[in-house]
């Protein structure tokens, strides 16, 4: 939300402020944590950013009004500087981006919903830090739901109360995925990498769509981002590759090293509409043409 790097001491102080906040709301992990329920409560039981700002402001004033020795003053001054910096960031979130981050969720229990959509049309126009923070929230929400649902389904499957075809699965579908999953967004790449590695254990899957592979590696992307992006493609079992610009051949060879032959890469810029290569990890590559029926063409609202 602030751009740049965050120092370790800022993270430690931020965590301490969060502990104070949750303690005020009755979530004290030091006392009776085994008996008290922390999860599964109504959304209104948990604090918002406005609550955090109020708590931070109040605690700063309490620290300022205290009496300290000269030695203690040095520590207190440093603490106040850190807390004031954090409070300013929280205030900016509440005042400027409160519409997106400050408030209670409209989905009280995501497990009760069959289909959930996220509209990114407004978010994509905001500065990168805000967009990325929203995306991380969405990924985390979907991943948490996948794990929760997957454990329940596995338990019922093991008990024999349901059959495999009765298992409720989790599928994440992202169109224009290059907007938030590219070589410059390291944290998002790491989260999706974890999802790709572990989601299958919880009956989860993901589909990523984009028009140009070059959009996944925008100009200025570093080697770390490229390698993490390559890892995403390696972990993806099925890849449908349609026609790409000839300028993308070098990137295709790098991303699909060991999966696509040079001859197949050379074919990609010359493919006709509908033709593609299906690359199956650990198996083979299949070249075929996607057939679009008249009924499908009527409801299709994209481009050619």
Model-derived features: positions:
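Conserved ATP-driven motor cores of ASCE-family P-loop NTPases powering translocation/secretion/packaging/pilus
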Residues: 1-4, 184-291
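Solvent-exposed, flexible loop/coil residues
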Residues: 104-105, 114, 272, 294-296
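Short, solvent-exposed amphipathic alpha-helical segments in soluble enzyme
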Residues: 134-137, 256-257, 293-295
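C-terminal alpha-helical "lid" subdomain
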Residues: 292-304
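P-loop NTPase motor domains
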Residues: 1-204, 278-282
């Amino acid at each position: 939300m602030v751009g740049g790097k965050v120092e370790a001491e800022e993270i430690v102080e931020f965590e301490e402020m969060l502990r104070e906040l949750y303690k005020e709301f009755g979530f004290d992990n030091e006392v009776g944590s085994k008996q008290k329920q922390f999860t599964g409560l109504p959304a209104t039981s948990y604090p918002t950013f406005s609550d955090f700002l109020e708590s931070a402001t109040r605690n700063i004033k309490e620290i300022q009004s205290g009496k300290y020795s000269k030695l203690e003053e040095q520590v207190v001054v440093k603490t106040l500087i850190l807390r004031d910096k954090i409070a300013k960031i929280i205030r900016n979130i509440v005042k400027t981006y409160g519409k997106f981050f400050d408030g209670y969720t409209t989905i009280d229990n995501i497990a009760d919903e069959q289909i959930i959509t996220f509209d990114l049309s407004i978010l994509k126009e905001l500065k990168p830090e805000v967009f990325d923070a929203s995306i991380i929230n969405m990924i985390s929400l979907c991943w948490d739901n996948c794990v929760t649902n997957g454990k329940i389904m596995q338990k019922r499957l093991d008990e024999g109360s349901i059959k495999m075809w009765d298992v409720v699965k989790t599928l994440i579908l992202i169109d224009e995925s290059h907007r938030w999953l590219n070589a410059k967004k390291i944290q998002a790449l790491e989260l999706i990498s974890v999802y790709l590695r572990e989601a299958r254990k919880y009956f989860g899957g993901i589909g990523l769509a984009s028009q140009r592979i070059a959009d996944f590696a925008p100009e200025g992307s570093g080697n770390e981002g490229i390698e993490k992006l390559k890892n995403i493609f390696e972990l993806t079992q099925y890849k449908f590759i349609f026609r790409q610009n000839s300028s993308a051949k070098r990137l295709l060879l790098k991303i699909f090293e060991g999966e696509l032959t040079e001859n197949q890469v050379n074919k990609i810029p010359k493919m006709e509409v509908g033709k593609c290569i299906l690359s199956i990890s650990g198996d083979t590559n299949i070249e075929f043409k996607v057939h679009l029926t008249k009924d499908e063409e009527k409801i299709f609202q994209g481009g050619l």
